[in-house]
């Protein structure tokens, strides 16, 4: 017997699963399809939330990244409450060296 779903999410990485959890919390019936972990992008990012270190030239993109970063502590707390598992989130900053272009 097939079960009707409201939403299909393709990709079981951090973003796809986060979207699925939030939609399901709001009452949607969600299915997530993911090929496998090796091909997912989530494990390559190492959990870095550093929009200032990305040299973003688009003000809109930088604004989006900054707003997302400020929402992250609330989201990780929500995940910990839902799952009973600590996320390990630690807002510790980064060190980003700045190099000047050589003058010739």
Model-derived features: where do they sit?
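N-terminal Rossmann-like FAD-binding beta1-loop-alpha1 element of flavoenzymes
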Residues: 5-31
